[in-house]
Amino acid sequence: MIRQMLTSLAALALAAPLAAQEVTPDPTDWAAITGAAEGQTVYWHAWGGSNAINDYIAWAGDEVAGRYGVTVEHVKLKDTADAVSRVIAEKSAGKDSGGAVDLIWINGENFAAMKEQGLLYGPWAEDLPNWQYVDVEGKAAVTSDFTVPTEGLEAPWGMAQIVFYHDTARLAEPPRSIPALLDWAQDNPGRFAYPQPPDFLGSTFLKQAVMELAPDPSVLTKPVSEESYHEATAPLWDYLDDLTPNLWRGGAAYPQSGPRLIQLMNDGEIDLALSFNPNEPSNAIANFELPGTVRSYVLDGGTIGNASFVAIPYNANATAGALVLANFLLSPEAQAHKQDPAVWGNGTVLAMDELSAQDRARFDAIELGVATLTPAELGEALPEPHPSWMVRLEQDWTARYGVGQ
């Protein structure tokens, strides 16, 4: 899908230059931005598959409405590419202002596609007042999205890293490498599942596996080529050929999302699963969606991590309001609220040593859940492959193993 998107975008770029927005707020004039934002409605296109995340977005919307007079409408997505396609359709129709999408929760290949074809407003992120708190030195992912420099075209708002989780009442010693996972699955058929790509968690499992199995993982940081792709992925397909018949339902069906994995474990159908939020198992336990015996861990060789971003399309109708919302999402208050496992449990992008004592206290007061790893236990996250790898992996996985929705 992303490859088709890029082809369409390239054709559009050749057909006509991008028109400027009728009104483009100056990101450095914050007083003017907040003034222009008042009364605007921001249509924030964001994944809507988690109640905890949806509740957080609703909370953020209530806060910016009360403080700045900005209304936030959460347009719930199953796939971020749907929002990108909407912007492409508007570009094709010549709608270069007044677009339907004001803010997108985005990263990876979707950001790369929009950046390449000039479909993003900006740069603006580093002009936000709350940018001063972002941990640029300690978290390289906040300025490099799947190896693609962000260059101020998107603002980070959360950190994520793969964790595996298991019910210790049924699985005391889980597998701690990708090869060991296969051995365990063959001995315990039907007790592991991952979501069906292109669900982002399912696709991330493929990337985690190929990083561990590829003869030379360093090639994954560069744009994919035919030669590098076939050499790096041959062990992955051999691995999945062996793993698939030992998955939940014998690989004949796949969960459609991370929340579905939680439900399967709670129902006793699987013993091992994964999440891209280290706090999600604790959050689920707190909400009585998982048994209290569930615990999380990372693989011995480390796990993939990245940052989540928000971006503003070039033709957004409420650019000022989107800037105000993005800035609020970077505030210590919003970041600490989001990191609380009882709320969402998503990691902060802020540097603690840049915060006031009062704001640091917000984070110090957060209690880690029973299934949440400490930063030391998580370890340093492995970098994401270049986004072009994800496109190819999803296409080939679907051709080899894809099943009907």
What feature does the model see in each segment?
Residues F111-A113, L274-P291:
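A ligand-binding cleft/hinge motif common to bilobed small-molecule-binding domains
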Residues A160, Y239-L243, E289-A311, R360:
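Periplasmic-binding protein-like
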Residues V87, M114, L261-N266:
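Hydrophobic residues within well-ordered alpha-helices
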Residues T303-I304, S308-E377:
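Mature extracytoplasmic/periplasmic domains
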Residues P27-E38, V42-H45, S50-T71, F164:
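Short, polar/charged alpha-helical segment
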Residues E22-T28, Q263, V370-Q405:
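Conserved C-terminal helix/tail region of periplasmic/extracytoplasmic solute-binding proteins
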Residues M1-A20:
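Gram-negative bacterial Sec-dependent N-terminal signal peptides
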Residues W47-W59, H74-D82, S97, V101, ...:
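Extracytoplasmic ligand-binding site segments that recognize negatively charged/polar headgroups
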